[in-house]
């Protein structure tokens, strides 16, 4: 009927010229709950060589969150943060999207994103599957098999009508229906 509000970050102009946008958290990248391969795809979007390999960054994120003092490969716990002059890990899931910048090495790894882009990309909510109808392009890129041509097609299609199921989305793009690969 034309009175629906999109939850994909589309800008609106309200009364008095106020501009606003709404974004569904389930369309964002769930940093606390994503598998390593998906975290790697997020990091790869920076497109530049990182001083710290993705595997080490992911291990550091997991060590930042876990409650033990055991080290994963190329990672660190509280003593490593203290030696680097940083606040120690919380040993809890991240509380805000910007907290990722406190995990050793992630500030440099995500330097291709502004703070606003981090907030527009990452959520700390328990998001398992991505809402493909509200996810920004940066989040859709982490789907296995997604390329720029498929991304453009998906975004153009959902502007006209939403995908009714995840299966319809994957079939439309010619991708395997599993979002939990590889």
Name each model feature, range by range.
Residues 1-182:
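Compositionally biased linear targeting/interaction segments
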């Amino acid at each position: 009927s034309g009175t629906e509000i999109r939850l994909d970050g589309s800008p609106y102009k309200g009364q008095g010229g106020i501009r606003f946008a709404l974004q569904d958290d389930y369309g964002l990248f769930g940093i606390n709950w994503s598998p390593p391969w998906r975290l790697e795809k997020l990091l790869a979007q920076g497109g530049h060589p990182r001083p710290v390999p993705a595997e080490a960054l992911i291990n550091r994120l997991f060590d930042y969150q876990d409650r033990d003092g055991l080290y994963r490969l190329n990672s660190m716990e509280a003593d490593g943060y203290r030696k680097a002059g940083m606040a120690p890990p919380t040993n809890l899931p991240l509380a805000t999207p910007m907290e990722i910048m406190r995990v050793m090495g992630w500030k440099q790894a995500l330097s291709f994103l502004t703070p606003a882009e981090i907030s527009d990309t990452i959520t700390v909510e328990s998001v398992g599957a991505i809402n493909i109808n509200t996810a920004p392009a940066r989040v859709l890129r982490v789907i296995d098999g997604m390329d720029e041509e498929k991304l453009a097609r998906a975004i153009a299609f959902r502007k006209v009508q939403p995908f009714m199921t995840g299966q319809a989305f994957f079939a439309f793009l010619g991708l395997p229906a599993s979002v939990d690969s590889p």
